[in-house]
Amino acid sequence: MDYKETLNLPQTNFQMKANLVQKEPNMLKYWEEKEIYKKTLETREGAPTYLLHDGPPYANGDIHLGTAMNKILKDFVTRYKTMRGYRVPYVPGWDTHGLPIEHRVTTTLGEEAKKKSPVEIRKLCKEFALKYVDIQREEFKRLGVKGDWEHPYITLTPDYEYHILDVFKTLVENGNVYRGNKPVYWCPTCRTALAEAEIEYHDHESPSIYVKFQMVDQPDTYVVIWTTTPWTIPANVAIALHPEYEYLKIKVGNEYWIVADGLLQKFASETGIEFQVTEKFLGKTLEGKLTKHPLYDRTSVIVLADYVTLEDGTGCVHTAPGHGEEDYQTGLKYNLPILSPVDDEGKFTKEAGKYEGLKIWDANKVVVEDLEKAGALIKFGKISHSYPHCWRCKGPVMFRATPQWFISVNKNNLRGKVLEQIKKVKWYPSWGENRITAMVQERPDWTISRQRVWGVPIPAVKCKSCDEVTLDPKVIEHFANIVKEKGTDAWFELDIKELIPSDFSCPKCGSKEFEKTYDTLDVWIDSGCSWEAVIRSKGEKFPVDLYLEGDDQHRGWFQSSIFLATAKTGNAPFKTVVTHGFIKDEQGRKMSKSLGNVIDPMEIVNKYGADILRLWVASTDFFDNIRVGKNIIEQQVEVYRKLRNTLRYLLSNLYDFTENDILPYEKLLPLDKWALGRLQKYIEQVTQYYEEFEYSKVYNATVKYCTTELSSIYLDILKDRLYVEAKDSIYRRSAQTVLYYILEALIKILAPIMPFTAEEAYQESPLKKYESVHLENWPEVRKEFINENLLEEFQQLLLVRDDVLKALENARSSDVIGHSLDAHVKIEPKNSEIGQLLEKYADMLEDFFIVSKVSILNELSDGINGQLVTVLVEHAEGQKCQRCWKYHPDTGKDENHPETCPRCSAVLRGERK
């Protein structure tokens, strides 16, 4: 007889081979057709809302691994919180104005760009941005990210632009916006001012020069300065000393030079001079003394400043208020001229005299030559240092004094209020709080004007009579209402008379004749107003629960958002902020095209499936920088296989089981009670990890649970009961009851991380109550299933099992047995407690060790010495049962089932229930 036909062999349509690349698009279609996202909101109508507000990616290219990881992490949060019973609306957004897009458009146009009107350029920028919104939307959807993809927020829409202007109006009303001629970061390539958040630091080689300035009242004495920007020497008007530092007058040849005591040795070693110290004095004694400018017929005054350090140079700081923030502040204090003889393209203007028309970087060489001719150059060298570059064109930037609009961070104690709000926010990781606090404490006023056309216009008007430039809340409000209908193109298309209220007049001279100005707002204001445009104005929960972005946003979106929200509402826009690190390659190097180590997330998705990419994201300690490469992804494929096989085992052994077959806890066998208790501990543990955004711990706990506790122990032990015992017997139903609970928990716990695979398993499972697993509720910890005493006993039994497995392996390698079912295991406990425990559970030990017979003896003459027991393995007596493969002395005694053991023959006779 073929006894295989009498076994309860596994059955399922859930295949071992995942075929994710083929299946996932069909799953997306299913979710869309069934409107699953919409139903997650409808089924939780009236429940508390959890709001994760999406930081908008920039719409100027395909998604990269960083943006993919960011969206996947957000999806972990929203799916988990939905299953916890919250109403979780998720509105994705895109940042669509600004220099990067305009730069791409004008670069593509080349010379043609100069022939285009602002409106034509803006139209092309809009088309470009919306094209990439559509591309990125499809890519994000393919990753399995759920949300309101048909109604995203896009910063170029009239409604959104209206709210930008509305927030801006509040800042103007409060007096936080002012116009000033201040040095700002300026990109000569892109020809615009840049904010701090638009600056990147890269290594850059600069000239390094020591220059001497002759004292007017002591012609043989010189003050020595050091600079890495010789091109700024034409704008020098002062030399700054620290009031409390000690300075030395040293004799070099026939001259006397002044340098700081703390930098003398370094200076002497770099210049190779021989010197003799002749005098010592504090910096403040030289305040107000005049020196001769080495290139022009004018003087440079000695001033005092606390920012002078003893790190580099001479302690005598070259000061050009038109080319540096600290220099500028010193210039204001001493009423110095603000010289900035450089135009938008980084070329010297006629104010620079002989240097007119030279680009500043080319001027470095000429200025150095002129200093040498004038006898003022002490030493020329080169230095490689970290230097500010433009985020868009990657070129070096300069500080340049130009008329710009600023937000004062100190007016109305805005900085102080923001610092107070930062303390109220929960930061993950916790060091995020210190980081943003330090940045806010040190940040300068915010340069908000851009000399570009692709952005929200600053509705400032210039009086034709007196040239006064005015930014008035009434004009902003009037323009904002036009924008609501027509968008910000209106500023470029409509006549000035339509753009301002009819009764508006110049506050300085009373004239009613104006012309437009054409600066646009910093794009960080656009995204920084999203809490108002997307959340607060729509009546959604404010402050929102969570912002989750890369840790570069401490100086970007987090900061722009908290400043603008605090200014308008008095509150931070978020309760919690989570940040992730940056993606590196397997060697820890930054990803770059030049290194050839860039990984396209869609390549991973198209080769392996989105669930593999998502599993990789879950595996990372994302709070820090994250490594990825081909080998790391391949490792996730292996892990995925193990998780999938666990699900397959569970599904394939529940094909004939429904909720009605569940046994009450008291009827379960001890091993099943242990497994059910362990399941509760696992649920409790991973739920806590999900709450704390510790997805790598969810991943590690789940992989360990599936591969160690389930596959290697519980599921392995169960095979005999599931396949061999009678279909409806307590032995099988007890096991199936726990498998049902495990499957239910595991599918739900995996659903936020692997939504496609969890859905596939759910659709094949006896659990299915809804159209989708993503409409299910989170598994609850059922305390009544936790018997601590039993769990402790099984902890001891598992240690005994380890001893037995080692002995079985030894017996296998010695050819005593082939399979563990060939074994008769004799056990001598090392103490009475273990002995009593083994006697208590004697009935289940054969299954527990997967052997044919177990004997507990007081003494063994031979055996393997283990941790808790001594184990002797012998070949089991009797014949091998052809149905269950166990050995038994009475196998073959049933005439109707001659090749079976007593247990199997009882099952076949229908007597074992």
Swiss-Prot record:
It comes from the Bacteria. Signal peptide: none annotated. A motif ('HIGH' region) lies at residues 57-67. GO terms for biological process: isoleucyl-tRNA aminoacylation. ATP binds at residue 593. Its cofactor is Zn(2+). It is an enzyme of class 6 (ligase). Its EC number is 6.1.1.5. This is Isoleucine--tRNA ligase. It catalyses: tRNA(Ile) + L-isoleucine + ATP = L-isoleucyl-tRNA(Ile) + AMP + diphosphate. Belongs to the class-I aminoacyl-tRNA synthetase family. IleS type 1 subfamily. GO terms for cellular component: cytosol. It is found in: Cytoplasm. L-isoleucyl-5'-AMP binds at residue 549. Binds 1 zinc ion per subunit. Zn(2+) binds at residues 881, 884, 901, 904. A motif ('KMSKS' region) lies at residues 590-594. It comes from Fervidobacterium nodosum (strain ATCC 35602 / DSM 5306 / Rt17-B1). IleRS has two distinct active sites: one for aminoacylation and one for editing. The misactivated valine is translocated from the active site to the editing site, which sterically excludes the correctly activated isoleucine. The single editing site contains two valyl binding pockets, one specific for each substrate (Val-AMP or Val-tRNA(Ile)). Catalyzes the attachment of isoleucine to tRNA(Ile). As IleRS can inadvertently accommodate and process structurally similar amino acids such as valine, to avoid such errors it has two additional distinct tRNA(Ile)-dependent editing activities. One activity is designated as 'pretransfer' editing and involves the hydrolysis of activated Val-AMP. The other activity is designated 'posttransfer' editing and involves deacylation of mischarged Val-tRNA(Ile). It holds the Pfam family Anticodon_1. Keywords: Aminoacyl-tRNA synthetase, ATP-binding, Cytoplasm, Ligase, Metal-binding, Nucleotide-binding, Protein biosynthesis, Zinc. Monomer.
